[in-house]
Amino acid sequence: MAKIILTQEVSGLGSAGDVVDVKNGYARNFLFPRGFATPWSRGAEKQIESIKQARAARELSSLEDAQALAAKLTSTTLTVPVTAGAEGRLFGTVRAGDIASAVENAGLGSIDKRRVDLTQRIKTTGVYQAVVHLHEDVNANVEFEVVPA
């Protein structure tokens, strides 16, 4: 097991500044090359403290921003234009990135596509819902309509 420091949020592991133990291969082949983590050392322990202090300072304002964005997202129905056939069947599927770009096109701000959780595969036009994880305490249910482009 390797002891590492996360440099950014990794789903299932933790957020930036957390010290976690992972298997050597996962750290060496996935986390380190993508810049998600650095090896743990005593000197890096001091970096962790500064990251955590900065995160705590941002936490309060980001919570308020996330709640404001969640209120906007739940009150708006997004439109996702996709290529579809005559009967409404899509050529492909709607992905989390499509929802994130629809939020940006609607002028509501930008969100990371990794924070969008689609509960089902979308293969036809219609109205659907997704969950957007804006903050660890704030989730927004987003309603969107898939329309032919």
Curated annotation (Swiss-Prot):
Matching InterPro entries: Ribosomal_bL9 (IPR000244), Ribosomal_bL9/RNase_H1_N (IPR009027), Ribosomal_bL9_bac/chp (IPR020594), Ribosomal_bL9_C (IPR020069), Ribosomal_bL9_C_sf (IPR036791), Ribosomal_bL9_N (IPR020070), Ribosomal_bL9_N_sf (IPR036935)
Gene Ontology molecular-function annotations: rRNA binding; structural constituent of ribosome
Keywords linked to the UniProt accession: Ribonucleoprotein, Ribosomal protein, RNA-binding, rRNA-binding
Highest taxon above the source species: Bacteria
Coiled-coil region list: none
Listed GO CC annotations: ribonucleoprotein complex; ribosome
Gene Ontology biological-process annotations: translation
NCBIfam families: L9
Family to which this protein belongs: Belongs to the bacterial ribosomal protein bL9 family.
Function in brief: Binds to the 23S rRNA.
Protein name (record): Large ribosomal subunit protein bL9
Protein's organism: Kocuria rhizophila (strain ATCC 9341 / DSM 348 / NBRC 103217 / DC2201)
Gene name of the record: rplI
